[in-house]
């Protein structure tokens, strides 16, 4: 398969690649670009999981810092992000290996920055260490105790 096709007409490249795979014409495949696409899909799955977790942690921090300002949209956002993670894990069990304490810390640091920017509250007022466990973050019923000290 011409490597130029990938750059010239991506959709046609996809269609041709599918055809070649379905017809076991492996020697005609553009393996270099096919491998890159598969790697990219893997990275995309991890990025989506990370993004959803950041949004969850960000909103949980808002519940802690500004409980009086909570809205239904916060609860809806938490539900939607948790639902996305749940669906991703149901479809790809191996993604669960991405949900580590180390990645929780990384996501928390980004969520902390976002919460500070959105609320206008000094970053130092938010806990340096994540006050939530991974289980709490993913638990559909979990909303931080509004009396919880931070």
Per-region residue spans from a language model:
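Surface/interface-facing alpha-helical segments and adjacent flexible terminal/loop regions used
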Residues: 1-54, 58-150
